[in-house]
Amino acid sequence: MRGGLTAFLLVAALAPVPAAPAPEPVVASVEVATRAPNNPRAKFWYRLPRGHDPARRERWRVLVLFGGRNCDGRPEVSGKLGWAAWADLNGVVLVAPTFRDDAYWEPRAWSGRALLDALAVLAARFGTSPRGLLFYGYSAGSQAANLFPAWRPDLCRAWVSHACGVFHEPSAGMRGVAGLVTCGDADAARYVLSRRFVDLCRARGVPVAWRSFPNRPHDVPEASALGLARAFFGAVASGAPCACWGEDGTWRVLERERIDPEYRSPLYTPALAELWRRPR
C-alpha cells in the first residue's frame, strides 16, 4: 500500500501544471491636467491587449486613435472599428483621448503636451514605449492623426488619415515617418484636399501612400479602408525596407522606376501591395 501511495504521489508531482490563462484585456483611463478651458482634466482611455505582461522586456507599441470630433475615446479602444482584435493579435496598446473643442487637433497649443503626459504615465505603469507611435484617425480625427505626427515626427513611426479635410505642411522632418492617406471618391471636397496634400508631399520628397475608394461617401469602409490601414501599420512596424511600389489611379504594382514620382505609393511588403491593389 505504501509503495502504491508513493508511486501515486510521484506521478502527481511530475504531472504538468496547467498553464495560467492569458490575462484578459484591460480597458481603463488616466487623466492629466491642462490649461485648456474645456479640458481642465483631459481623459485618455487605454486598452492593454489580451495576454499583456508588464514585466516583459520588450516595450509595448502604442496606437493612438482619434475618432470623430469630440469622440469619447472609450468606444475607440473597446472594439469600435475592429482595432481591439488587431491590437490583441499584434501586442499593441490602444490609446484614445476624450477631448472637447479648444482646437484639440492642433497639438502645439495644449493637446500635444497632454498626450505626452498621458503616455508618460502609461510608460511608467505598464512599460509602453513613448516612441515609435502609430496614429490613426477618421473624419475630424484624421486631422489630429496627421497633425500630431508633424508636430513630433521624432516620436512617430507611421500615421493614417481617412476622409481628412485638414493636413499639415509637409516638411523634411516627415521623410522618415510613413504615411497613408485614404478617402472615398464620392466624398468630393475631402477627396480633392487629400489628393492635393499627397501631391504636395511627393513634390517635397515626403513619401506618402494613397488609396481612394470608388463611390464611397464620407464613411469608413471596414473591409477596405480599415483593412488597408491595419495592414499598413503591420508592414511598417515590421521594420522591413520598402520593397513594393504602387501606381495611383491604375492601382498596379510596378518597379519603382516605372512609376512617375507624383503617382508613386510606397507599399513596403507584397502582402500590403496586394491588399492595396485589390482592397477588400
Ranges and model annotations:
Residues H52-Y104, A188-Y191:
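Short substrate-entry loop that stabilizes the transition state in hydrolases
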Residues V62-F66, V93-T98, G132-G137, R157-H162, ...:
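Structural recognition of the beta-strand scaffold that forms the well-ordered cores
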Residues L65-C71, A123-F126, Y138, A145, ...:
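Cell-envelope and extracellular/periplasmic
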Residues G4-A15:
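Bacterial N-terminal signal peptides
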Residues R157-R230:
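The feature captures the conserved acid-bearing segment of alpha/beta-hydrolase catalytic domains
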Residues V17-V62, W110, Y136-F148, D199, ...:
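A domain-start/cap signature at the N-terminus of enzymes
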Residues R57-E58, G73-S78, E106-R108, L147, ...:
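Short, solvent-exposed loop/turn and secondary-structure capping segments
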Residues R50-R59, Y104-A140, A150-P153:
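Gly/Ser-rich "nucleophile elbow"/oxyanion-hole loop immediately N-terminal to the catalytic nucleophile
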